[in-house]
């Protein structure tokens, strides 16, 4: 049966995902940045209270995936922490300035991760050649690759995703970016073994007093009074589609 991974940005979201049938959680912070390394407090709380597999993301900042030596050193320290806390896997990715997988750094990541399953995240979609990148990641021992098929969303990139799956002896290809209940069946029919979804909604903040003339974000258009939350009904609907597909 296809596996459903839900991207969660809080303890509350992780609990919602678990209750509604998620098979695995990608744990992140900072949804507006596309996901950054969670805090120690969140990591420990989730490790203590969530029973399904949780893979934290290791990403020190937003933007591209070419990191300074200092940033990369911090990533290795975060990987060691995630390993010490007992998580079964992690999610990360590093590139060279030319858009190739940074194999030298991936070797260090894999060594730091040890027995943990490593997912190479959507840095893959920024690679110059996805097929060369997939071969390199297979050589590195990466367990899976999260990809939209190098398109804005996985529905647009489905043909490339199918080509990547056809490569055979390679990491698991997990489709992600815009995967929802209304298009999930297309991925299942295409033979995708794992899907990744935020299954989320933005909710208004409960704050009554609001200083509308001030933003805490560098993006002055950012809505300071909305919060991301995993929608349990969406997770349950997607899991139901997967179960019914398996029963065919």
Curated annotation (Swiss-Prot):
UniProt similarity note: Belongs to the CutC family.
UniProt entry tagged with the keyword Transferase: no
Assembly and interaction partners: Homodimer.
Organism expressing this protein natively: Salmonella heidelberg (strain SL476)
Principal location: cytoplasm
Descriptive protein name: PF03932 family protein CutC
One annotated GO molecular function: copper ion binding
Localisation per UniProt entry: Cytoplasm
Signal peptide: none
Pfam families: CutC
GO cellular component, one term: cytoplasm
UniProt keyword terms in alphabetical order: Cytoplasm
InterPro entries documented for this protein: CutC-like, CutC-like_dom_sf
């Amino acid at each position: 049966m296809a596996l459903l991974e839900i991207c969660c940005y809080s303890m509350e979201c992780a609990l919602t995902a678990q209750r509604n049938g998620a098979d695995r959680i990608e744990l992140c912070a900072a949804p507006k940045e596309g996901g950054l390394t969670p805090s120690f407090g969140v990591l420990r709380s989730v490790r203590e209270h969530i029973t399904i597999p949780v893979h934290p993301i290791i990403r020190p900042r937003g933007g591209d995936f070419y990191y300074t030596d200092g940033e990369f050193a911090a990533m290795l320290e975060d990987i060691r922490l995630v390993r010490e806390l007992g998580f079964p896997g992690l999610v990360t990715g590093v590139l060279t300035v030319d858009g190739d997988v940074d194999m030298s750094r991936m070797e260090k990541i894999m060594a730091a991760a040890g027995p943990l399953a490593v997912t190479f995240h959507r840095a893959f979609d920024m690679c110059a050649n996805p097929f060369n990148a997939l071969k390199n990641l297979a050589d590195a021992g990466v367990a899976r690759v999260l990809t939209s098929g190098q398109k804005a969303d996985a529905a647009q990139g489905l043909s490339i995703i199918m080509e990547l799956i056809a490569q055979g002896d390679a990491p698991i290809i997990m489709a992600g970016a815009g995967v929802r209940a209304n298009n999930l069946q297309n991925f299942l029919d295409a033979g995708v073994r794992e899907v990744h979804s935020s299954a989320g909604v933005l909710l208004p903040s409960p704050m009554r007093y609001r200083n509308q003339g001030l933003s805490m974000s560098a993006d002055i258009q950012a809505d300071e009074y909305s919060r991301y939350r995993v929608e349990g009904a969406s997770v349950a609907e997607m899991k139901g589609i997967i179960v019914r597909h398996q029963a065919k």
